[in-house]
Amino acid sequence: MKTLFSRLITVIACFFIFSAAWFCLWSISLHLVERPDMAVLLFPFGLRLGLMLQCPRGYWPVLLGAEWLLIYWLTQAVGLTHFPLLMIGSLLTLLPVALISRYRHQRDWRTLLLQGAALTAAALLQSLPWLWHGKESWNALLLTLTGGLTLAPICLVFWHYLANNTWLPLGPSLVSQPINWRGRHLVWYLLLFVISLWLQLGLPDELSRFTPFCLALPIIALAWHYGWQGALIATLMNAIALIASQTWRDHPVDLLLSLLVQSLTGLLLGAGIQRLRELNQSLQKELARNQHLAERLLETEESVRRDVARELHDDIGQTITAIRTQAGIVQRLAADNASVKQSGQLIEQLSLGVYDAVRRLLGRLRPRQLDDLTLEQAIRSLMREMELEGRGIVSHLEWRIDESALSENQRVTLFRVCQEGLNNIVKHADASAVTLQGWQQDERLMLVIEDDGSGLPPGSGQQGFGLTGMRERVTALGGTLHISCLHGTRVSVSLPQRYV
C-alpha cells in the first residue's frame, strides 16, 4: 500500500511538472513561430521526446496523456486547427523511442548517436501526417528537428546528472555542511554565455554573416573541458543567446536553421569527444595492464635468477670445495711423486678459477650485496669492489632516496644501472672522475651517473655495453633512460615512485 501511494504521488508530480514545463515551452515557441499548432512541434515536442528517451516506459502514458490534455485544452482555448495530426504524430514517435529504450542507460558515444538517430526518426514521423499540407510539411519537419535536437540532448544531460549521483535525504548532519558552488565552473559558463550573447548583439552588420560560425566556439571550448555534457550545455547557451538577440524577428526560418545546425554540431562534437575519451581510457587501461605484466615479468625473472644463483652457490660451491680437498689429499699422499703432486696443484688452481668464474656469474645473476645491505650500502660496496681509486678514478656518491619507498624491482634495477654504468666507465671511458647521484623529485626516483671521460666509443651509439637491457628494464617499470655524451658521459634514469 505504501509503495502504491508513493508511486501515485510520483505520477501526479510528474504530470503537473511536465504540464507546467510543456506549457511554458509552448509559450516560448509561440513567440517564435506565431502559430499555436506549429508551436506544439517546436520545444514542447523536444521536451516530451527527450523525457521519453530517458525515463522508464511506465511514465510514457503520463507524458502522452498530459500532452494530449494540454493540446485539447489549447484547441478549445485558442483554436488549434490540426489537433488530429498532432495526436497521430505523437503516437508515431513511440516507435523509434521504443526501439532504443534498452540503450538509454548506457553512456558511451554510440548512445549519443543512437539517440540522435532516434530524434531524427521521431521528427520525421511527427511531421509525417503533415505531408499532404504542402509547404507546412517542410515547416513541421524543420520545427520538430529543431525542437528535438535542441531540448532532448539537454534532458539527457540532466538525467545523466541525476542518475549518476548519490542523493541523501536532508538531515541535521547535512545542514551544517558547506555547499560546494564550484565557482570556477560557474564563472566559466557565465563568461562563455556572455561572449556568445555579445557575438549575437555586438558584431557590426558587415560581420553578421559570420555570427553562426561563432556559435561553434563555446561548443568546442566546453566540449574540450567537460566532454559531451559540456558540448550539449553549450548548445543550450547558444540557443538562449540566439533567441534573446532579437535579430531573427524578420527571418524566423534563419533562427530555426541556426538552432538546428548548432544543436547538431553540439551532438556530433559531443559524441566525437566522448569517443576520444573512451579510447583514451581504454588505452590507459591497456597501458596499465601492460605495465603490470612487465613488472610481474621482472619479478619472475629476478625470482628465477635468485633461485638459480642459490642453487649454483650451494651445489657448485660444495663440489669445488670437495675437489680442492681431494686435490690436497692427493698432494699429501703422493709427496714423493712430483708429477702427481704437480697435477694436484693444477687441479686446485683450476678449481679456484672455476670458483672465481662462478662467483662472477652469480654476481651477474643476482647482486649478492642487495641480500644483506641497503641500496646505498650496496652501491658503495660495488664501487669499492671495482677499485675505482686504484684505477685513478675519483668517485663521489650522493644518495638521497628513502629506500622504504622502493619496490624490490626498483632496488634491483637501480643497482644494475649503477653496475653497468660503472662497468662501462672502467672499461671504455678513460675517465678520471665519476659522480653518482640519487634523489626523489615530484613522485619520481632520479639517478644520474656522470664521468669526464671520452664518452661512448664511435659507432656504439646508445645501445651497446648492456645499455639496451638496462633501458628495457627501466621502461618496463614505467621509467626513462637517457644518455648524453657531451663532455663525458651522462646516464640519467627516471622511475615513477611506488609506495610500499
Swiss-Prot record:
It is found in: Cell inner membrane. Part of the UhpABC signaling cascade that controls the expression of the hexose phosphate transporter UhpT. UhpB functions as a membrane-associated protein kinase that autophosphorylates in response to interaction with UhpC, and subsequently transfers its phosphate group to the response regulator UhpA. Can also dephosphorylate UhpA. Residues 274-500 are cytoplasmic. Kinase activity is stimulated by UhpC. The modification Phosphohistidine is found at H313. The chain crosses the membrane at residues 8-28, 36-56, 80-100, 112-132, 140-160, 185-205, 213-233, 253-273. PANTHER family: NITRATE/NITRITE SENSOR PROTEIN NARX-RELATED, SIGNAL TRANSDUCTION HISTIDINE-PROTEIN KINASE_PHOSPHATASE UHPB. One of its GO terms (biological process) is signal transduction. The keyword Hydrolase applies. GO terms for cellular component: plasma membrane. The gene is uhpB. It catalyses: ATP + protein L-histidine = ADP + protein N-phospho-L-histidine. This is Signal transduction histidine-protein kinase/phosphatase UhpB. GO terms for molecular function: ATP binding; phosphoprotein phosphatase activity; phosphorelay sensor kinase activity; protein dimerization activity. It is a multi-pass membrane protein. Keywords: ATP-binding, Cell inner membrane, Cell membrane, Hydrolase, Kinase, Membrane, Nucleotide-binding, Phosphoprotein, Protein phosphatase, Transferase, Transmembrane, Transmembrane helix, Two-component regulatory system. It comes from Escherichia coli (strain K12). Its EC number is 2.7.13.3, 3.1.3.-. Gene3D superfamilies: 1.20.5.1930, Histidine kinase-like ATPase, C-terminal domain. InterPro entries: HATPase_C_sf, His_kinase_dom, MASE1, Sensor_HK_TwoCompSys, Sig_transdc_His_kin_sub3_dim/P. Residues 311-499 form the Histidine kinase domain. Autophosphorylated.
